[in-house]
């Protein structure tokens, strides 16, 4: 009986490993290379040897283009300047988040020279905490930064 239960446990372990490998939710930071900055919360990076569009997890910056919103251009310029001047860029996926959004963009935390870009954008008043569908890893820090930016009426919070 002990032999059979040992075999069953081993088989379940192998099945669990296979399941985890197939879903590929990597929670460690992975170094990447910027291909193109698109706007304040989206960019293209080289990820797993592929050019992929990445949506910055848990934040939203004002729109640019035809439907430009207040601080949209400033947020986009700030983000692009930060990304273009970075010595090291890393992506980190969040196990509480979907891997892709409805537009098939990878959802990730972005680190520039060790600093969380989303936290910087929220602190500077260029982004708001948005699209929260789980208990994301850096959510508490983002919420605190947003409250501080709101109280100080920085950036997008000047008018609100």
Regions found by a protein language model. Give the residues of each.
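Small beta-barrel nucleic-acid-binding modules, primarily SNase/OB-fold domains
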Residues: 2-160
């Amino acid at each position: 009986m002990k032999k059979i239960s040992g075999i069953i446990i081993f088989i379940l372990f192998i099945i669990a490993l296979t399941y985890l490998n197939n879903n590929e939710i990597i929670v460690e930071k992975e170094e990447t290379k910027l291909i193109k900055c698109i706007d304040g919360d989206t960019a293209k990076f080289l990820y797993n040897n592929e050019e992929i569009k990445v949506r910055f997890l848990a934040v939203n910056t004002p729109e640019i283009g035809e439907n430009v919103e207040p601080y949209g251009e400033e947020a986009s310029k700030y983000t692009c300047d930060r990304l273009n001047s970075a010595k090291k860029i890393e992506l980190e996926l969040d196990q509480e988040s979907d891997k892709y959004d409805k537009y098939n963009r990878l959802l990730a935390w972005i680190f520039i020279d060790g600093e969380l870009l989303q936290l910087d954008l929220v602190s500077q008043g260029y982004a708001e905490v948005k699209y929260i569908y789980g208990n994301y890893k850096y959510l508490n820090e983002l919420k605190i930064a947003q409250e501080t930016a709101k109280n100080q009426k920085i950036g997008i919070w000047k008018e609100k």
